[in-house]
Regions:
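Soluble catalytic regions of membrane-associated enzymes that act on cell-envelope
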Residues: 1-242
């Protein structure tokens, strides 16, 4: 009964018609054409056909914290070092505004809708395609690590239905220093590094950070002064970068 009532409450605005605006065919085609790229422009930058793949999902980070993306100077110097040894995509925009929306965008390439989150509709979410399943067909092992509670936003359910081999969250790291939301990032990075050395190859492994989420109770220094309102957030990003 609870699931039925919850579903009705979350979708009641759709009972009165389509809540989305309809664009003309010309507008739609013009938008889609921007994504068309000739195949010969693709460059293969790896030497290994089956490299290990590591995703580090940075909680609440934005271009405002990254100097090369017209952000403030000095907040993320270590990220800047990574830019010099990799590729930085500058024409990239957020797919949503909550963590649960991000998961289905990142792993299932599913767009975010304004009023509903598909991850909370398990019967639909389990039918989504997933990079994890595609890589598994190529012999990949998959894992996901988070220092907080993956029950938030129904993320754990989504990861299970997408058949990740290893899923670990706060309860698996209860011996590590923690704040109100979970294990501090510096300790999770250490654990993650250790776990990577144990995984069967090739693998796809993900770490979702936490310390740059409110209430920003990380154990690092608060030495960056931006403005009173944003100081805690900016310093939390600097902490994760460090």
């Amino acid at each position: 009964n609870w699931n039925l009532l919850q579903s009705i409450f979350k979708n009641k605005r759709n009972f009165y018609g389509n809540p989305y605006k309809k664009h003309s065919d010309l507008e739609i085609n013009t938008f889609i054409d921007e994504f068309k790229v000739e195949n010969q422009s693709t460059k293969f930058i790896l030497k290994n056909n089956k490299p290990n793949i590591v995703f580090i999902l940075l909680e609440s980070w934005s271009a405002d914290n990254i100097e090369s993306l017209n952000g403030l100077n000095g907040i993320t110097p270590n990220f800047k070092n990574l830019e010099n040894n990799g590729l930085l995509f500058s024409n990239f925009f957020s797919n949503g505004w909550t963590s649960d929306q991000a998961m289905t965008s990142i792993f299932s390439s599913f767009p975010v809708f304004p009023y509903v989150s598909i991850i909370n509709q398990t019967d639909k979410a389990r039918k989504l395609p997933c990079i994890n399943k595609s890589l598994r067909e190529e012999g990949y092992h998959s894992s996901y690590y988070f220092g907080g509670q993956l029950t938030y936003g129904n993320i754990k359910s989504y990861l299970y239905t997408q058949e990740f081999n290893i899923i670990k969250d706060e309860k698996d790291f209860n011996n590590l220093p923690s704040g109100k939301l979970g294990v501090h990032d510096e300790y999770m990075f250490d654990v993650f590094h250790s776990e990577l050395n144990k995984l069967p190859e090739p693998f796809m492994s993900t770490l979702f950070t936490l310390s740059s989420h409110s209430p920003f109770d990380f154990p690092g220094e608060h030495k960056i002064s931006f403005n009173h309102r944003e100081d805690e957030y900016v310093n939390s990003v600097a902490y994760t970068d460090k």
